[in-house]
Structures are given as C-alpha cells and as structure tokens.
Amino acid sequence: MKSFEDIKLTLGKNRQYLFNKYPIQSMAVFGSYSRNEQVADSDLDILIEFNDKIGIRFIDLANEIEELVGFTVDVVSRNGIKEKYFEKIKPDLIYV
C-alpha cells in the first residue's frame, strides 16, 4: 500500500505533463487517502476540474493516472458532481 506522501510525490512529478496533455484546471485528492484513513484495498479518489471539454479522453486520463500510481483510481469531474456531494468532500480536498 502506497502512502499519501508517495502518491503526492508521484502526482506532483507528473502534474505538468498531465496538465499539458489534458485540459486540467485543477486536480485534488479526496476520500480515505486525503484523510489518512486508507486501507490495503482503498482506491484513490481524485476530483478534476477541466478548463475545456475532454470527452472520451476522460477515460485515457483516468487510465494514465492509474498507471502512474499503480492501483485503482476513481476520477470524478467537478462538473459531474452535484453541489451537495461536493460540499461533503470539500473539506477533504488536497490539491496536487
């Protein structure tokens, strides 16, 4: 199981590459990893805000992040999450 620090380091090293390849405005980790409550089978929850349409490339982005971190990732678009759910995860957001 990777630590949150390892994940932040991996995402940080690849941030510019991902932001250049995809129309990403911001990217944040939330959920168990951001609260340091992850267990061996936890996935990584990532909220991404886009500055342009991404379309089917959303799947490519999710797969690419999964390859970088080496385990299951659940990527959520900021536009795709209802405001009431965003308010629930907002305190957990750690931008990378």
Features from the language model and the residues they span:
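Catalytic core of pol beta-like nucleotidyltransferases
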Residues: 1-26, 34-40, 50-96
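Short beta-strand->loop micro-motif that forms the acidic, two-metal-ion catalytic signature
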Residues: 45-48
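Conserved histidines in hydrophobic membrane contexts and catalytic metal-binding motifs
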Residues: 29
